[in-house]
Amino acid sequence: MQTSTFTITSKSFQDGGVLPKKHSNFGEDVNPELEWTNPPQGTKSFALINDDPDCPIGTWTHWLVKDIPANTTKIEENSVPGVEVVNSWGVANYKGPRPPSGTHRYYFMLYALKVEKMKAKNMKDFYKEVEEQKLGKAVIMGKFSKP
């Protein structure tokens, strides 16, 4: 039985804190560093969803990464550890925060999965498959406002 909690942290920002401008669409538009510990036993891969639930037209997905190897414990800044899937921007890469107004929350949700490779080829299938295949989930959230 696993007693440790599956946790995700970042050297780029604190959970609930402000995302640096460099990680936004107003800055360098590079992904933040993310690191995790204690994935569930039986984890065969990871998948990452980065989204903004405060978007006026509904949740906006900024980054989708699948097939992150099970032995991975970190995503370096400005790097891709797996296969990217097309996001709400219509591109298969990280696109940082660009809120039209106000302060938005940006969630980085890391899923530990029971499969090595995901079948999902689009955003809708990606969300569905992570729910079906997840063993655990770790979340960190950063906030950002239009500069």
What are these regions (language model features)?
Residues 1-147:
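N-terminus-centered regions that define maturation/targeting leaders and the start
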